Amino acid sequence: AIKERMLERIAFTKPDVVFLNLHGAAVVEGFDDCEGDLLSSIKALVGEGTPIYAVLDLHANVSPLMVKNADLLLGYNTEPHVDIRKRESECVEIYHRQLEEGFVMKTAYAQPPLLLPAINTDTNGGAMTPFIAQAFEYEKQAGVINVSPFAGFYGSDKYNAGPSIICTVTTDVSDAQAICNDISNIFIDKKDSFFVHLDPLDKIISTIKSAPSKKYAVIDECDDPLGGGPADGTYILDKLIEGGINKIGVSTICDREITEMAFAAGEGAVIKGLLGGKTDNKHGRPLPITAVVTKLICKPIPMCEANGEEFADYGETYTDYGRIAVISTEQADIVVTENKVPTEMINIFRHLDIDSNKYSVLVLKGFGHSYKTNFSDKEYVYFTAESIGVNNPDVTKIGEFKKIRRPVYPLDMK
């Protein structure tokens, strides 16, 4: 339905150029390459004489079909993605340059046989840093319009899941292909830099108990809402409770049933039920709870911290949490949301008027490096937990891949 509406509007407006902001790793039932299909459908509609320019996420799974049907594809150069508007502006600038100068662009593409986790793709010291730096060096060469290395998204079971490189030039396409091949080889050489150590939960619990005066943050990357996780995973919280850990603050668990129960009962009431673990059996069990409803909230909450200059591109973007219930068990305060939402770019406790300093342990879903930015005013010992879920940084433990090209590291080789 989305595709049909887009095509109808494009046909109605008869544009001189089509600008798109696509993620690049979308998955739709019935289409292995839905964004390639979308671009090819738009190209068939507007014809070869109407250019198509698109901006893609750094974690796009770029396919040859996408490259074939777009005149220019630009990837974000940052993780966290703070250059969205900048890359969109560059797209328009390149179009105007092409109109004025009349150059013809040629694009090459390469994809190494890799599947890399997203957890360490930070471009400010993380594994993607040298790739972006190399791309900028190549862009200094005469005739090079753009070089975009993509980390890919490992949670999509599609043929072209994984890292790739696009290079667009005004010289011979062989120049672009040489650049793509070079960066592809660098991906292969540096592949292990993307994989991180995951802390076993029994060791995390032992560490917390051995130094109880410190504050800890346990990151649940395996249930990352921005990566397709259901955000109702309970595995880490379950283990911490079982291990006797107290003063836990949890951000967040999505559970519409518990939220409805809390709002029906009201603040101060005691509720009993099963929390989380209801979307599937991949992120932990539904937890039996007896809890006091301590807060009920219905208000807009920003996607990013208002004072976070690095997230200025997101502007006044608000996330639809739906209704929010904060419930308290003997061992944990849990932020329960009606809708699945990301919280890695904000301190959700502050927005709910909760002092997170009162917690000894925070359990946070999403990227650890983003949380470190938003909790930088506090001294935490950070752990990325060895947990379970569809965003497991150990890509061999995500599940069965049926569509991805083979062989691919690390699924098939060491």
Residue ranges of model-derived segments:
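Hard-cation-handling environments
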Residues: 119-330, 335, 339
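N-terminal glycine-rich anion-binding loop in soluble enzyme alpha/beta folds
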Residues: 1-8, 162, 166, 173, ...
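Conserved anion/nucleotide-ligand pocket segment
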Residues: 88, 92, 96-136
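Short, acidic/turn-prone active-site loops that include or flank metal/cofactor-
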Residues: 77-81, 275-278, 387-389
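Active-site histidine-anchored catalytic micro-motif
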Residues: 3, 12-98, 220-237, 241, ...
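Short, charged beta->alpha transition segments
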Residues: 2-13, 203-207
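Short acidic/histidine-rich motifs immediately flanking catalytic phosphotransfer sites
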Residues: 14-17, 213-214, 359
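Extended hydrophobic packing segments that form well-structured cores
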Residues: 4, 188, 305-414
